């Protein structure tokens, strides 16, 4: 059996980019290392008193879990000390983070340290999501928020890590999507899903139907449609939703389906974060042959105006996303 580690695979991907300096390779390797640190604590969370709430709220106004803070700290410290990133942004921090030695970095990192952390106390899969951009300017010492507020189409790499029954890291550099499973016996991520291609249509839909009363008429009609009996179109679809975006997305990426987080009367602009969740997953989804929009516009074309900007999200198999969009737009 030919065992390919994530570090080796990242190095091999460099040949597709003749102009590559190797710096991005080091960045992705740093992210993989940080994921190992977070994974170590996630699997021990119930034993070392890092479950439950920390007693604070983040910039989103949400109660912060202890493990959120731990994961955030580990990622910042593990990645920010090497001088490869000039600026960073985290879902858990109000503003940008300027790491030590940033004057040598040429990239910006945006990340959600622990997506789905509300599930950690009940042992449901959680994950880390990340996104990498090249700096807009030539002077890393002057890196600013503008280097973070780039359209998703400017990403040079994106990925996520799922901490579940196994630990899986998925990433893209714009040349396909590849997945790696962590082998704890050797401490390495090994290639397990090469060149992931998501089905054009699926059989699952993922949405929080507990918010049905807050949905607009388009979303309600879509839900009625998706549940109707029609063998010709593969309906009804089955519901799969556990409230952990990265886990729901990963399942649909592999099996086919659509994840929908529409606007509601409570969150008229959507709830998910454009920079930390929607953009990186949209980049991955499109690279795997899928589609990602806010119901009307391509996610990767949205010009961000704030670090913690929110957005609706329709993401997954291309045909399924198009159908959901048509209901959102009132075409159906």
Curated annotation (Swiss-Prot):
Q: Name one GO biological process term.
A: fructose 1,6-bisphosphate metabolic process
Task: Indicate the enzyme's highest-level EC class.
Answer: hydrolase
Q: Which cofactor does it need?
A: Mg(2+)
Pathway annotation: Carbohydrate biosynthesis; Calvin cycle
Keyword annotations of the record:
Calvin cycle, Carbohydrate metabolism, Cytoplasm, Hydrolase, Magnesium, Metal-binding
Record-level GO cellular component terms: cytosol
Where is Mg(2+) 1 bound in this sequence? 91, 112, 114
* EC numbers for this chain: 3.1.3.11
* UniProt subcellular location: Cytoplasm
Instruction: Give the Pfam families listed for this entry.
Output: FBPase, FBPase_C
Q: Which SUPFAM superfamilies match?
A: Carbohydrate phosphatase
Fetch the CDD domains from UniProt. Answer: FBPase
UniProt keyword Chloroplast, yes or no = no
Residues given in the record as substrate binding sites: 115-118, 208, 241, 271
The positions annotated for binding Mg(2+) 2 are: 112, 115, 277
| Subunit | Homotetramer.
Q: What is this protein called?
A: Fructose-1,6-bisphosphatase class 1
User: What is the protein's species of origin?
Assistant: Chlorobium limicola (strain DSM 245 / NBRC 103803 / 6330)
């Amino acid at each position: 059996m030919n065992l390919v580690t994530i570090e080796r695979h990242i190095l091999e991907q460099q040949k597709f980019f003749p102009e590559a300096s190797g710096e991005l390779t080091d960045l992705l390797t740093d992210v993989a290392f940080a994921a190992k640190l977070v994974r170590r604590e996630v699997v021990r969370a119930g034993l070392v008193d890092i479950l439950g709430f920390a007693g604070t709220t983040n910039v989103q106004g949400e109660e912060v879990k202890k493990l959120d803070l731990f994961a955030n700290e580990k990622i910042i410290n593990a990645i920010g000390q090497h001088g490869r990133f000039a600026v960073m942004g985290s879902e858990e921090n109000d503003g940008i983070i300027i790491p030590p030695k940033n004057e040598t970095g040429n990239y910006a990192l945006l990340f959600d340290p622990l997506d789905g952390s509300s599930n950690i106390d009940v042992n449901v899969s959680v994950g880390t999501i990340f996104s990498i951009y090249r700096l807009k300017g030539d002077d890393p010492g002057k890196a600013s928020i503008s280097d973070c507020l780039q359209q998703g189409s400017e990403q040079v790499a994106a990925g996520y890590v799922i901490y579940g029954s196994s630990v899986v890291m998925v990433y893209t550099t714009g040349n396909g999507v590849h997945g790696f499973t962590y082998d704890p016996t050797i401490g390495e991520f090994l290639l397990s899903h090469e060149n992931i291609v998501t089905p054009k249509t699926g059989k699952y839909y993922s949405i929080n139907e507990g918010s049905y009363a807050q949905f607009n008429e388009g979303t309600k009609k879509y839900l009625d449609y998706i549940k109707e009996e029609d063998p010709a179109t593969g309906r009804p679809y089955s519901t799969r939703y556990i409230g952990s975006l990265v886990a729901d997305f990963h399942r649909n990426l592999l099996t086919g389906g659509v994840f929908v987080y529409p606007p509601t009367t409570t969150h008229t602009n959507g709830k998910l974060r454009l920079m930390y969740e929607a953009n990186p997953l949209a980049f991955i989804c499109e690279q795997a042959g899928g589609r990602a929009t806010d119901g009307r516009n391509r996610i990767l074309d949205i010009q961000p105006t704030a670090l913690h900007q929110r957005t609706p999200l329709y993401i997954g198999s291309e045909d399924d996303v198009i159908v959901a969009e048509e209901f959102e737009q009132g075409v159906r």
